[in-house]
Structure formats: C-alpha cells, structure tokens
Amino acid sequence: MSSTQGRKRSRLACETCRELKRKCDGNQPCGACVRFEYDCIYNKQTNTNKRRKTVEQDKEAPLPSPPVHVDKDARPYVTSPHHLQSLEANSGAAFFRRLALRLDPKNAPRMHTFSWNAFLGARRTSQVPVSRPVTEMLSQEGMESLSEIYFEKLDPIYGFIDRDWISRITQNRWSGLICDESEDAVLCGIAAIACLFSEVEPLPLELDLIESARFILEQNMSDTPSVTGVTGWLLRVIYLRTAETPHTAWMASSILMHMLEAAGLHCEPSEESVFQVAEEKVDSELRRRLFAVSAHLNIWISFDMGRSRTILCNSTLEMPSTREGDYTIEIMELLPYSTDLDPHKTHDAAELEASLSTVLKRVHSVPPSIMAQCNLTLCLCRRLQSMNTSFTGKTLEQILSITQRGIEAAQAIIDARAPWHQMANVPFQIICLLLAIDTRESLAQLNDAMQCLNNIATVYNTNATKEALNTASLLILMQQRRKEKCASNLSNIVKSFPILPLSETQVEAPLQQMDDMRWFNNLAGELSGFDYSDLDRFLSQSMF
C-alpha cells in the first residue's frame, strides 16, 4: 500500500450511526448495527445530496496526507463491544434512544438528554449577567438570609461546608476586611444556589452571582488550588448540574476533579509517600466530604453523557462520621456501587444482580437521597437489561417499590420548590424502564410517573420540562400502537381458526377426559358470544 494513501471513509452513513456519532461502513446493514442489533436505516435523499456534494468537492480536493499511525494497543477497550454496551446502558439518554428504536424505528425521537434537569440552560432573564463584587449585589442581611436557605435545603444532602466559616467570612467581607478572592466565589455560589432553590423564576441577581463566581474561579485557575477555591468550583458544578446543559456541567466537573488532585485533597495523608499532600491544614471530615460529593457528581454527569469520568490516581475514599440532620453519608455510601459501573470494568450478570440486591435493600431517608438511590437502581437495571436479564418475582417487586418511592420523592421536591437536578430526570427514566420491563405490574405504575412529570412541567414551565413530558407521552403511544398491532394479529388468527366444541360421544373415554371436554365446551360456549371487535379492545387494555 502506498504511504501517501489517505484514510478511507464511507461516504454513506446510516441514520442510527449518525444519531450515535459512530463510524459507519456504509453497508446495508452496516457492521455497527449488526453488532449491536440496531435497525439500519438510510436516508435516501440525504445520501443522494451528500454523494453529489462529495463528487463536486473531490474535483478540487488536494492530495491526501500521509496516514497517521495510531497505537492499536493504547486503549484496547475503546472498541470492545462490552465497553460500548456498558457505556450505552449507563447513559439514560442512550437507553431511551435504544428503547425508542425498538418500539418504532421509523418514528423514534432523536438521542437527547431529555429531562436531564428542569432548565437545560434556559434559566435566563432579558438582562446580560454582569460580574460584580458580592458586596455590591447583596447586603450583609441579604447574604445571611440566602445562606440560611442554602444550609436548610442543600447542605443536609451535600454537606461539605463549615457553616461557622461562612458566618465568619460574611462578617469579614461586609466589615471591609481584606479577603481571599476565592471566598467571594464561595459566597456567590452559595447565594446563587439559594436563589435557584427559592425562586421558581430566575432573578437577574442569581445570574449575576453565578457569573461573578465563574469569573473569579476561571481567573485563578493558574494559581495553586486551595480548599476555598475547590469549594467554589464544587458549588459551581452543583449549580450547573441543576440549571445548565450537560456539556457545560461535565466540563466544569472535570476541572473540579483536577483541582482536587492538584490541591492534594483526593487522598488521605501518608507519611510513607513522597507525593505532595495538601499544603493547607485541612479537616479530614471536610476533605472527605469535598472529594465524595465531587466524585458523585462527576461520575453521574459522565455516565449520563456517555463520556469519560475523571479517575484520579492514588485517590482514597473513607467515610466521614455521621452527624444529626446530615444525609451526605447516604450519598457517599452509594459511591462504591457507582464506580463499579465504570464501562471499563467487566462484570457478569450475577455480580450486577448482587449489587442491585444490596442497593434495593438500603434505607434512604429524605427525597434527594431516595432519588440518588433510585437513579443508581435504574442504571443497574439498564445494565442488566443490556445482558438480556429479565426481572420477575421478588426482585421485580423491589424494583417497582424503589421506582414508586422515586416518584414520590420527586413530587415532594416539587412541593418544596427545590429543583434538585434529578427531580425531572428520575421520573422520566422510570417511565423508560417501566416500558422496557413491559409487564402488567410495571405498566400499572406509568400513570403515577406521568402525573409527576406533568406536575414538574406545570410548576417549572420550561421547554425542557415540556419536551420531556411530550417525549414520555410519545414513548407510551409508540408502545400502545405496538401492542395494538400485536393484539390485532392475534385477533385475526382467532377469527381464522375459531374455537369448535369437542365431541363427547366417545363412551369409552376416561372420566377425567370427559370432565376436561365438558370444561372446554363450557368455556367455548362462553367465548362464542364475544364480539371480536370487543376482543381487540380487551387484548389492548390487558396488555397495556
């Protein structure tokens, strides 16, 4: 082969590979769709136009560049079917897309992070956000009031800030004392989250606060990270996960993890290691909480998007002590099960079933913690379903019990007007799982989940919540039509082969056989009065 020959690409790509951004070989069906059992569909009009454009461009195209040699053994798991299967199962968006393709390949909605949060970047006002000193935006009383809201609504679940420290830096800042600029980022982050968790509609103040925090944090990125700076970044990630787009939150979360590592906050201090540890004297409880909450957010943002999470070398995770009124420990205890779902790790169905059983038996106390438990359960179920595992008996009962608790937790959060990032995502993903399980028991729970999603769209009336509600309705409609088609096919067969009574004239037939014949004839007589149009409706309702 000539060394000047460029890399060959297919000029055609099927719609499935386009949606999933995969390399397509242009065959019918293509190799990727065959491997992962997708429906391989080509858009003829698009392909014709692209072929015409490609031919025109090739006339003036320069000579191809020499091929770039890549070490095939550098990351062997990238092309592994198991890795891709796990990556898709971890992502709620990819699971939704596969479910939609299974129900109706022609009309399946595009792959999108529906309901990832209630806003998806739409929490805006007509005014352009401006970065300003926190003392120009708030009075001391205003800052203290917003701090109260933060410590009431968010700190019990994500407890990583010393409340007394916030009181001290607030007092110092409004007293005119010289403060670390990163402290302003922390105050702005707390105040912005408090606004988000107390106001249904965004205020210009909220957007100015988050813009001011962003400006300070990004301006100081070249400095050696401090605990205060890392705290400011974590507050920013929490806000972005709750109100912004997935990509923005993922980028900030990745930066946060690297900041943790650079500050030496990702591992327990050790006298045996020569690696640098945190230069500041950091309370071990605070350090563990900072790392755990950061890792929790980074893992699930990455899983949701189907992207790489940030894995820190030499990181350690030790549980902090429990304290009254704090539920952060419940979130942290889920982390080992979350990290085990990394797509690079290989688990068989038995191992995942054991993890699912353990998670299902856990007791979580408050709505946000219950939704975290439910979210992990949903992911484990998706992973098992990707291995063609079915749920029956007690396991199915436990799964449906957790999903029902997840729906109730989401409703409690709506009532509290505290838009936790999983408020809309968990009910939407519950609907997807219920449709995928596809039993009478699972489908019976759909109404509660849809009502919850509708309530979210009513309170937080955004394009994101309305699109999530409409998409969930579309999925259910697709399931209904699929079942109606199956019911119609069964009905046509019954019409073609009607039930005929058995003859009872065989005198020598055993007594048991005679009883069976009478039972069958009685049943046939009862069914003979059925209108087959009624049978169509009967089958549709019982199956959906």
Swiss-Prot record:
SMART domains: GAL4
Disordered: annotated span: 50-71
GO BP term, pick one: DNA-templated transcription
Entry's localization field: Nucleus
Keywords: DNA-binding, Metal-binding, Nucleus, Transcription, Transcription regulation, Zinc
DNA-binding region(s), residue ranges: 14-40
Top-level division of the source organism's lineage: Eukaryota
Any one of the GO CC terms: nucleus
PROSITE patterns: ZN2_CY6_FUNGAL_1, ZN2_CY6_FUNGAL_2
Annotated GO MF terms: DNA binding; DNA-binding transcription factor activity, RNA polymerase II-specific; zinc ion binding
Broad class of the protein's primary localization: nucleus
Function summary: May act as a transcriptional repressor of multidrug resistance genes.
Protein name in the entry: Protein RDR1
Organism of provenance: Gibberella zeae (strain ATCC MYA-4620 / CBS 123657 / FGSC 9075 / NRRL 31084 / PH-1)
Recorded name of the encoding gene: RDR1
